[in-house]
C-alpha cells in the first residue's frame, strides 16, 4: 500500500505526535540495549552461567523481538490512525504480537516451576538441571506460544466485509479466540505461577523454622554457660587446644605478650566474659576502613552484604589479644585461619579452611538462590501488573461486547503499558541482583578502562 488517497484527519496534533514518537523510540532503543546487555551478562559472566539462566536469555530475546518487530509498527499504526503496510503483514504482525507476549509469560511460568522443583526436590532435580534439559524446556515454551498464536493465520473465521475508508489492523474479534487466547496466554499461566510461588514460600518458611529449631536444639545441647576465670578464658569449653601463633608477633610490635590461651571456643554471649569479645573489630577489609564488629552482623543486614562477607571470609588481620583492639591490627600469619560467624563467634585453628570453605560455599549458593528467587518473583509481579489490564479489558469485550466495552483510549493505554514491560526486566535485574550489577558494570566499563578514556 502507498498510503491514503482521501482526506484524513490525524489522530494527534504535531506536538503530541512528536512527543509520543520520541518516547516510544526511546522505549525501543532502551529495550534492545537492556535485553542485549542481559544476554551478554549471562553468556559471559561466570556467576550467571548456571543452566537455568538460559531462561532469561530466551526471555530477553523475546523482548528484543517485541522491540524490533512489533512496537515500531504499532507506533506507526497509532500515530497515523490507519494501517499503512500490507494487509498480509497485518495478519503476521498480530500473530507475532501474540506469540512474543505468550512466550514471555510461559517463560515466566517455566521459570517458576524450575524454582519450585529446585526447592522441593533439590538433590534429584539439580542433577538433572543440565543445559540440554533447559533448552528442551525453552523449545517447548516457544511451541506452546506458537500453538496459541497461529490459529488466526490458519482459520480465518467468518469473513467480514472490508470496511470502507482507510485500512485498519485490529486484534481478532472472534469471541472464542479472545477467551481461549487470553486464558492460554495469560490467566492460566498466572494462576500456575501464583500457586507455585505460594508453595515455594511455604517450603522456605518451613525450612527456616526447622533451621531455627535445630539451632535452638544444638544450643541447649551445648555445655553450660562458660564461667570466667582469672585469666579471662572460659573454663567450660571442651574443645581441642589451639595455640595462637600471634603472641610473638604481638611482642615484636611492642605489645606485651598475652598469656597463652589453652582453650578456644565460641565467643560467649555473656557480657562479663572477656575472652574474644563479640565487638572485636578484628576483620577489617582492606581499602574500606573499619566496619562493624562481627556481633553486629545479622541476617537482616541484606543478602548483598552477606555474600560479600562470605566471599571475603579469609581475614587479613587479627589483634594479638583482646586488649589490643584499640591498637593497629596485626598481620595474621599464613599458618592459621579465622572463621567469623554472623553471631560474632570467632574460631581459630590451623586446618579449618577446608571444612569451613565448603560450608561458606554452600551458604553463598543458598544466598544467591534466595535472592534470585526473589528477583524472579518481582519480574513476575511486574509482568502481571503491566499485562493484566489489557487482558482483562480484552476478555471483557468478548464476554459482554455491548455493555462492558472499555473506551478505545483507555484500551490503547493498557495496550502500550503491556509493551513497556519488555524494557523493565533489565532494570529489575540491576536493582535487585548484585550478580547482574557486577556483570553489567564489567561489560560497560571494561572498554573504557582498557582504552584509558
From Swiss-Prot:
SUPFAM superfamilies on file: Family A G protein-coupled receptor-like
Biased composition (Polar residues): 287-297
Keyword Membrane attached: yes
GO terms for biological process, alphabetical: adrenergic receptor signaling pathway; angiogenesis; female pregnancy; G protein-coupled receptor signaling pathway; MAPK cascade; platelet activation; positive regulation of blood pressure; positive regulation of MAPK cascade
Subunit architecture: Interacts with RAB26. Interacts with PPP1R9B. Interacts with GGA1, GGA2 and GGA3.
Locations listed in the record: Cell membrane
Region (Disordered): 213-331
Cytoplasmic side of membrane: 43-54, 114-135, 199-375, 433-453
Acidic residues bias: start-end ranges: 300-314
Membrane topology: Multi-pass membrane protein
UniProt protein name: Alpha-2B adrenergic receptor
GO annotation, cellular component aspect: cell surface; cytosol; intracellular membrane-bounded organelle; plasma membrane
Ranges facing Extracellular side: 1-17, 81-90, 159-174, 400-408
Family indicated by similarity: Belongs to the G-protein coupled receptor 1 family. Adrenergic receptor subfamily. ADRA2B sub-subfamily.
Keywords, ordered alphabetically: Cell membrane, Disulfide bond, G-protein coupled receptor, Lipoprotein, Membrane, Palmitate, Receptor, Transducer, Transmembrane, Transmembrane helix
Transmembrane segments: 18-42, 55-80, 91-113, 136-158, 175-198, 376-399, 409-432
Record lineage: Eukaryota, Metazoa, Chordata, Craniata, Vertebrata
CDD domains: 7tmA_alpha2B_AR
Covalent S-S links between cysteines: 90-169
Amino acid at each position: 500500500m502507498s498510503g491514503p488517497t482521501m482526506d484524513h484527519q490525524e489522530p494527534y496534533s504535531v506536538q503530541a505526535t512528536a512527543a509520543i514518537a520520541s518516547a516510544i523510540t526511546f522505549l525501543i532503543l532502551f529495550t534492545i540495549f537492556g535485553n542485549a546487555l542481559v544476554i551478554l551478562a549471562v553468556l559471559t559472566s561466570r556467576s550467571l552461567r548456571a543452566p537455568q539462566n538460559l531462561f532469561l536469555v530466551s526471555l530477553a530475546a523475546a523482548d528484543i523481538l517485541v522491540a524490533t518487530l512489533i512496537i515500531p509498527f504499532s507506533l506507526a499504526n497509532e500515530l497515523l490512525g490507519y494501517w499503512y503496510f500490507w494487509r498480509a503483514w497485518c495478519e503476521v504482525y498480530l500473530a507475532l504480537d501474540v506469540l512474543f507476549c505468550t512466550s514471555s509469560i510461559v517463560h515466566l511460568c517455566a521459570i517458576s516451576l524450575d524454582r519450585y522443583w529446585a526447592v522441593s526436590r533439590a538433590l534429584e532435580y539439580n542433577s538433572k538441571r543440565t543445559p540440554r534439559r533447559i533448552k528442551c524446556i525453552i523449545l517447548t515454551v516457544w511451541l506452546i506460544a506458537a500453538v496459541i498464536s497461529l490459529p488466526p493465520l490458519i482459520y480465518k473465521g467468518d469473513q467480514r466485509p472490508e470496511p470502507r475508508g482507510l485500512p485498519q489492523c485490529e486484534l481478532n474479534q472472534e469471541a472464542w479466540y479472545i477467551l481461549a487466547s487470553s486464558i492460554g496466554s495469560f490467566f492460566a499461566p498466572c494462576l500456575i505461577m501464583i500457586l507455585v510461588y505460594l508453595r515455594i514460600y511455604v517450603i522456605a518458611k518451613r525450612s527456616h523454622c526447622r533451621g531455627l529449631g535445630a539451632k535452638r536444639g544444638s544450643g541447649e545441647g551445648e555445655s553450660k554457660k562458660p564461667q570466667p576465670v582469672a585469666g579471662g578464658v572460659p573454663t567450660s569449653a571442651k574443645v581441642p587446644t589451639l595455640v595462637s601463633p600471634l603472641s610473638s608477633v604481638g611482642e615484636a610490635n611492642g605489645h606485651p605478650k598475652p598469656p597463652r590461651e589453652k582453650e578456644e571456643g565460641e565467643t560467649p554471649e555473656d557480657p562479663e566474659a572477656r575472652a574474644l569479645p563479640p565487638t572485636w573489630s578484628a576483620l577489617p577489609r582492606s581499602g574500606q576502613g573499619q566496619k562493624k564488629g562481627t556481633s553486629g552482623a545479622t541476617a537482616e543486614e541484606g543478602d548483598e552484604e552477606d555474600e560479600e562477607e562470605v566471599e571475603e571470609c579469609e581475614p587479613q588481620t587479627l589483634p594479638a589479644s583482646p586488649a589490643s583492639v584499640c591498637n593497629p591490627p596485626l598481620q595474621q600469619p599464613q599458618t592459621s585461619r579465622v572463621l567469623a560467624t554472623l553471631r560474632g563467634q570467632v574460631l581459630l585453628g590451623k586446618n579449618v579452611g577446608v571444612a569451613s570453605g565448603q560450608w561458606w560455599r554452600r551458604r553463598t549458593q543458598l544466598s544467591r538462590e534466595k535472592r534470585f528467587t526473589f528477583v524472579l518473583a518481582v519480574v513476575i509481579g511486574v509482568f502481571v501488573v503491566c499485562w493484566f489490564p489489557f487482558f482483562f479489558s480484552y476478555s471483557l469485550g468478548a464476554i459482554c461486547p455491548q455493555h462492558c466495552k472499555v473506551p478505545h483510549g483507555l484500551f490503547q493505554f493498557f495496550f502500550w503499558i503491556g509493551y513497556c514491560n519488555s524494557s523493565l526486566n533489565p532494570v529489575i535485574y540491576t536493582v535487585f541482583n548484585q550478580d547482574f550489577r557486577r556483570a553489567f558494570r564489567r561489560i560497560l566499563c571494561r572498554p573504557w578502562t582498557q582504552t584509558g578514556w
